[in-house]
């Protein structure tokens, strides 16, 4: 069962779907990169808060689960402990951010999550999310501090042991214990790269970029991130295949299932503070227009004749939302060309949006011939890269819908 929301935050129950593996988030194609610019030390995490629309959506989701799901599971405080554990497993599955002290402090909200979810009281779940995000930031800053001090300062003579999979490990007692754990994690990462032949300067640069990227993403947390995580911990109580999709996730899911989208047909990723073009979808509007090129970096996005919006430093999914749009509409991109000598050189590219067919994910067939003992055999081969079904076309009665 998939519980999805449209852009008005009203959830609706769609047909029973089972997710076979992770759903790739295709915007124009969404790929997340680990390359980011150095984080401003003065940056502060802004706690996220639930919205009225999310509270309403929560109530509707609770009703749908109670009255339309095949599993007859009531919503009460008896459910609270399981929701709490599932939520923490989602937010800190390896138990590397929170401490036992944190878990004990959260016990005050743990007991009543069930009744709160039934009535749309989301603040307890958001309090947990904000605490985890704050702990994530603290841990990443600690890691960056170790790297900035120089990895040569780390003691590699100690008889250290580290548990790689910590999903079943006990929570560390306090912040001091977490400091020790994270020091071991950094030392383990350094040793792994040394064994691969990297020198210390390269190792420091790699680790710094890794943790700065994670830190930037932590600062960019949004209310919808917390809501989706919390709702999935909640809906997962009914069965593993009951999921909540936010409007953005629902749209990406439909794109992947229908193998088509309306946009410009460009695969994007984050690169420092920019959104960079990775590749163009063959036959898509951007590919046909011919000006946008791989490795171009997007500076601003404009809709039709409207003023451009500067998108430097934006989250990748938010940039994608600006670039997507209905077919036959025009989006204008200001980009730094891949071959630009410096970042002050930009050009403006207007592209008319259209339907983009993701043919590379479609099933394909081929016939190969094999010679064996003087005989030629023709063998049919069917390649199915992914499972898909265009639900919208199917519901519209199109006899030739893609599936």
Regions found by a protein language model. Name each.
Residues 5-22:
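Bacterial N-terminal signal peptides that target proteins for export
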Residues 21-31:
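Bacterial N-terminal signal peptides
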Residues 75-161, 215-270, 330-332, 341-368:
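Extended, small/polar residue-biased N-terminal targeting/export presequences
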Residues 89-90, 111, 125-141, 145, ...:
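PDZ/PDZ-like domain segments forming the peptide/carboxylate-binding groove
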Residues 39-47, 58-70, 108-112, 206-213, ...:
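Acidic/histidine-rich, surface-exposed loop or edge segments in extracytoplasmic proteins
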Residues 49-50, 63-76, 216-222, 244-261, ...:
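Cleft-lining beta-strand/loop regions that shape enzyme active-site pockets
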Residues 55-59, 63, 77, 81-89, ...:
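Solvent-exposed, polar/charged alpha-helical surfaces in well-ordered, non-transmembrane soluble domains
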Residues 35-39, 205, 221:
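Boundary at the C-terminal end of the N-terminal hydrophobic targeting segment
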């Amino acid at each position: 069962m998939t519980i999805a929301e449209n852009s008005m935050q009203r959830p609706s129950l769609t047909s029973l779907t089972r997710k076979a593996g992770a759903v790739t988030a295709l915007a124009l194609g969404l790929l997340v990169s680990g390359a980011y610019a150095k984080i401003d030390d003065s940056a502060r995490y802004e706690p996220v808060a639930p919205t009225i629309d999310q509270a309403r959506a929560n109530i509707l989701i609770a009703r749908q689960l109670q009255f339309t799901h095949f599993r007859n599971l009531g919503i009460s405080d008896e459910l609270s402990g399981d929701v709490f554990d599932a939520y923490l497993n989602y937010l800190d599955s390896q138990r590397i951010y929170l401490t036992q002290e944190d878990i004990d402090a959260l016990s005050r909200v743990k007991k009543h999550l069930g009744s709160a979810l039934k009535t749309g009281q989301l603040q307890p779940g958001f309090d947990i999310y904000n605490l985890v995000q704050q702990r994530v930031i603290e841990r990443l800053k600690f890691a960056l501090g170790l790297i900035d001090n120089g990895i040569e300062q780390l003691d590699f003579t100690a008889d250290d042991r580290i548990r790689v999979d910590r999903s079943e490990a006990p929570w560390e007692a306090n912040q001091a214990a977490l400091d020790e754990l994270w020091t071991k994690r950094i030392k383990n990462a350094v040793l792994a790269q040394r064994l691969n032949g990297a020198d210390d300067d390269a190792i420091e640069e790699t680790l710094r970029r890794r943790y700065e990227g994670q830190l930037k993403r932590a600062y960019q947390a949004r209310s919808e991130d917390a809501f989706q995580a919390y709702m999935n911990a909640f809906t997962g109580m009914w069965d593993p295949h009951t999921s909540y999709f936010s409007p953005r996730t629902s749209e990406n899911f439909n794109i992947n299932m229908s193998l088509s989208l309306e946009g410009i047909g460009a695969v994007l990723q984050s690169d420092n503070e920019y959104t960079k073009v990775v590749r163009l979808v063959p036959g898509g509007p951007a590919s046909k227009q011919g000006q946008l090129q791989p490795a171009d970096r997007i500076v601003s996005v404009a809709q039709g004749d409207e003023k451009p919006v500067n998108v430097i430093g934006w989250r990748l999914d938010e940039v994608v939302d600006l670039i997507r749009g209905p077919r036959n509409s025009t989006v204008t991109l200001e980009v730094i060309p891949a071959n630009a000598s410096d970042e002050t050189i930009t050009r403006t590219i207007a592209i008319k949006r259209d339907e983009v067919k993701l043919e590379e994910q479609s099933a394909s067939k081929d016939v190969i011939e094999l010679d064996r003992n003087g005989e030629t055999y023709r063998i049919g081969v069917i390649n199915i890269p992914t499972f898909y079904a265009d639900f919208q076309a199917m519901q519209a009665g199109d006899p030739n819908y893609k599936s």
